[in-house]
Amino acid sequence: MKALLSLLTAVAVATATPLDLSLRALPNAPDGYTPAKVSCPATRPSIRGAGSLSPNETSWLEIRRKNTVQPMTDLLGRLNLGFDAAGYIDRVSSNASNLPNIAIAVSGGGYRALTNGAGAIKAFDSRTQGSTQSGHLGGLLQSATYVSGLSGGGWLVGSVYLNNFTTIADLQSGDHGNVWQFSTSILEGPKAKHLQFLSTADYWKDLLKAVDGKSDAGFNTSLTDYWGRALSYQFINDRTGNGGLSYTWSSIALTDPFRRGEMPLPILVADGRNPGELLIGSNSTVYEFNPWEFGSFDPSIFGFAPLEYLGSRFDNGQLPRGEPCVRGFDNAGFVMGTSSSLFNQFILRLNKTDLPDLAKDVFSKILTAIGRDGDDIAVYGPNPFYGYRNSTAAYSRSRELDVVDGGEDGQNIPLHPLIQPVRHVDVIFAVDSSADGPYSWPNGSALVATYERSLNSSGIGNGTVFPAVPDVNTFVNLGLNTRPTFFGCDPANLSAPAPLVVYLPNAPYSTHSNTSTFQLAYSDSERDEIITNGYNVVTRGNATVDKSWPSCVGCAILQRSMYRTNTSMPAVCNSCFKEYCWNGTVDSKTPRTYEPTLLLGSTSTNAAYTQGVTWLVGILAVGVAMGMTA
């Protein structure tokens, strides 16, 4: 393991010019990256059942739902619905369960997902200049209760929240140190203004030192630890200059703005992998990280651990007397890295890339070796669910819990936390930046995976209901992969309450935003062009593609609420639902290759499907060093 990291260090040094590191900014870990023993609270931490929301989330929701009333009133009032939206929200606001309950989900897909998703968040944020003008959707973020992300979408969610719920514009501007400076690869390290590191070699030594500290304290580590530390340098604005070393995911819950309910609840998603498995199936356990807890609603676990005390040695849901409490395990970078442990996924997607055959062969051999040694996962040990409920499941008998990228089960949009009945979500704005086809555009596979899982005969869906969606061929043949589509428009057709899903697939409005998941370096202009394109995706070019789109967004927001309150929908919603709701039509013949053209005028040179050269050179060099190219 350390030999492999040393090789990566050597490769990075050999292919990079000397670099600097700048400063970044919730650190509350007791000993930096190393989890440490601390005094237990008077009520010792324990695992709780997943039959309800946590007391923390329940009490927070009482505050947050009230805080969405005014932003929602303002937003709906701007969307040309032709009825008294403010009056309706005022009438139902006395009972929060009748208010529209909005969620936003941002898919995985590396930096492509980060930047395209950032465009969506920027469009939904009323703080973005111009976002509350006619044709725009600013205020949807302020009206939302939940925001979920996985993999690259998780980096986006994490970076926004760990930098004090900052704006996308601020992250682009450089006002937060050197976060979001992607012109150099994560393998090389960030550019430095404050010269903490003089070179890439120093950067890698720092990563190694931090992870060694965790290992020396008795915790098993994997490649995800190094990956997470590297991500922190790109996404956390730590003013001490040490790359978010002491930042924890649970510390989000301690910030005053979050406690006041001034922002949605952030959730990251990851998948479980049983001991001895390499590939992740559709019935794998789906875990979530929210600011208070780590766990799963799936029947395999059906429990949640207090996130702040991960690393403590729980047994059958309790922390035995004599066992110390541990804090600092939920390092923010490690959590983001867990949700984006792409190493296994790279093997699955290699043949869909334009990498040379030699590179594919080398890459496959390296990653297979990593997977065989168990280094491609995030190790959560001690396993907080060891012996929990006296379960016979494989996870319960393992002292460690293996967790991987949240999209490896095919559910590349983090819908799982949002379709749980106890959360009562009404509408999900699902931003899909998946690379499903040969040119890295989405084709609805992520929605299909979630729908099929809800029907799985194994019972893994555990009572969740998801609207019907067509097969992926139909998505492409009907053009549902090119424009927004609503699923679940008529709640009367559902077997139980479920959200309306507004599907927002990545498409080329102003630039070709289908960059490769393998691309690890972006110029500022390329980054910004894809963010602008993402803004255009969710606003339909600020309603220039369809002037009725903002009204239709309002209809999607209101539909479930008005159904519950037996209120007639605005007349404009009839035409909106006719235009955007999937009507059940299926066309499953093999589609032609999807090669779209720009929907709006180009803002840049073509940014289509490119590989990260530094990554490729690094992999080949490692392969040569390991004797894998013979």
Curated annotation (Swiss-Prot):
PROSITE patterns: PLA2C
Glycosylated residue positions: 56, 95, 164, 220, 283, 351, 390, 443, 456, 462, 493, 514, 542, 566, 583
CDD domains: cPLA2_Fungal_PLB (cd07203)
Propiece span(s): 607-630
SMART domains documented for this protein: PLAc
Residue stretches spanning the membrane: none
Protein name: Lysophospholipase 3
Family: Belongs to the lysophospholipase family.
Induction comment from the UniProt entry of this chain: Strongly induced by lecithin.
PTM remark: The GPI-like anchor contains a phosphoceramide lipid group.
Membrane topology: Lipid-anchor; GPI-anchor
Domain of life the protein comes from: Eukaryota
Chemical reaction(s) catalysed: a 1-acyl-sn-glycero-3-phosphocholine + H2O = sn-glycerol 3-phosphocholine + a fatty acid + H(+)
Organism per entry: Aspergillus fumigatus (strain ATCC MYA-4609 / CBS 101355 / FGSC A1100 / Af293)
Role according to the record: Catalyzes the release of fatty acids from lysophospholipids.
Cellular compartments per GO CC: cytosol; endoplasmic reticulum; plasma membrane; side of membrane
Signal peptide per UniProt: 1-16
